[in-house]
Amino acid sequence: MERHCYLEVAGARLLGVIHEADDAATRLPLALVYLHGWAGYRIGPHQMFTKMARRAETQGFTSLRFDFRGRGDSEGATAETTLTTMIEDALAATEYVLAKTGATQVALIGDCSGSEVAIGAGPQHPQIAAQVLWSAPIVAGDRARTDLAKRKSVLSAYGQKLLRRDTWSKLVRGNLQTDQILKVIRGGGKGAGEQGDASDRAIDWFARFSGFRGPRLFIYGGNDPTTAGCLAHYAELCDEAGQRFDLHVVEGANHAFYSLAWEDEVIDTSLTWLRAQALSEAPGHATR
């Protein structure tokens, strides 16, 4: 059973979709809240959030997918969206799903920038019990290495396109969006505003990361140019914070897991891990 819902945050109305098992007796106490990436919306990359929420429903999970302010069908100015506002929205979504369903705890499922949001929101609510982070960028550390790897990957991709006949045909016909291409190259693959707002830079990211005491699962694509740097960073960060480093690497996969086999592996791995957390009697975390 899935239905649309609306939640209010800072005077803006956010659109969401709730998924619940028809039989209330089969519902697990752990609800899933999905946090899309910077340029995404509630369906996730190539509808992975929608697919996972529907699959999760058959396993007893309640899910909430929603659009952040300024994204998708939610109200709010696109240019005013920051990681800080996205964290506020994630906390409001957590409150909403707890109030409107029988769930008693929440797991945050973040994709790319949504993983940063999950990390930022984690210790801010006592009923956030677990996190699943897909292709999480580096927080609480130097991103220069992974940003450079991403920029090189973007340049390589456009370099390969230059060798294609259809690219030159588009250029001759005036159908090539050169302004957009230059914008992407200059930004190193980052969208407008993704470099970070002053309010985002003011967040103590290590405190947010280490302050969350629940389990985390990191999932990366083996062929994502940022993976090596991220794995080294988060292994060290987890060790420094005294936390377990649960990791799954999808061999051959890119940043967004663009194949049916890769996305199935991500979804199945996430749900298997989440079900183990839902059936565990261990508390989620201890600090705000």
Q: What name fits each language-model region?
A:
Residues A39, F68-G72, I138, N254:
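Alpha/beta-hydrolase active-site loop signature
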Residues G44-H46, S74-T78, G229:
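Conserved catalytic-core motifs of eukaryotic protein kinase domains, centered on the activation segment
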Residues D22-D67:
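Short, surface-exposed "cap/lid" segments of acyl-processing enzymes
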